[in-house]
């Protein structure tokens, strides 16, 4: 029995399984939204959930609890991984940072430029310039794992490293470009919560409950401040100690304990809540609008071109080297997979257009189509057109 449980847990934590689960949740959301349960689906997402303490009240639709709350946990895990890599991992050596950093930079600049070129002159549609800059790491990794043993493991490490910088880019974009009216009082409370975590860290205190309380206060204050609440997750991660006073791995333990919940609950639930595009509301004109074309070109063309071009230049001018055991063809195949924006692109789309249906959901459909095309083409290319090395 224990062996079965262990195998199930291993399966769930496998990146490929996580990607397959996201695909299932995406298809399920599309079926439910366009079937007889569509009304229940919308009621579920719009269900108000909250609490009040005295004059303070926090009452939000369930969809916002997912997008602002659960995704903060995902960004918290990204922050933990980033801190771990910089202090004790591959990023401790500056040479290992150059290639994924340049790749991520190209994967942000080129898609954004393509989107802007298509939508130039329209201030409202230009708000979505960051939509095609994101990559859904779980999906991309899942497809890479399915491509066969001739793909070296170094490319998986490259994709994971690229994803970290890609997520940092997304965090900065959200913080700088997608904030609303700011609240000074909320910022003061957030600052006090950060100060408390800094003191806990400097004193070497590793009581999880203390950090949890501070992180909740920080999350609520950031939510009320006008800055997107997911930033609370990444900030909290930076103050988590690497180890206890006894030398036990504290940060690693927290990171490992979150993997199951992120892979099995948070990301699938996010996909189910955000991928429900109502196909009956989409018209041909909306599909060929500047926003839809910009998203498709940015994700399917811009991502692979930008990531590969900047990677090639870094290698060509000897700022970086190819991942061990790989060749340029295989590297390009991985670059194609970065066009799978899916959950992260849907997330930024919701911030850019404030979950509006002004484009008749054609923007969401463009994200799904571009992600699907990137995934299929990336798989075919890596599986059948790359040479063994």
Curated annotation (Swiss-Prot):
Q: Which GO terms describe its cellular component?
A: plasma membrane
One of the protein's GO biological processes:
regulation of pH
Q: Where is it located? A: Cell inner membrane
Has the keyword Cell membrane been applied to this entry? yes
Q: Does the keyword Lipoprotein apply?
A: no
Question: What are the recorded GO MF terms, alphabetically?
Answer: sodium:proton antiporter activity
| Lipid bilayer topology | Multi-pass membrane protein
Q: Which reaction does it catalyse?
A: Na(+)(in) + 2 H(+)(out) = Na(+)(out) + 2 H(+)(in)
Free-text function comment from the UniProt entry:
Na(+)/H(+) antiporter that extrudes sodium in exchange for external protons.
What the record says about family reads: Belongs to the NhaA Na(+)/H(+) (TC 2.A.33) antiporter family.
Name of the protein in its database record: Na(+)/H(+) antiporter NhaA 1
| Organism of provenance | Campylobacter jejuni (strain RM1221)
Record lineage: Bacteria, Pseudomonadati, Campylobacterota, Epsilonproteobacteria, Campylobacterales
Give me the gene this protein comes from: nhaA1
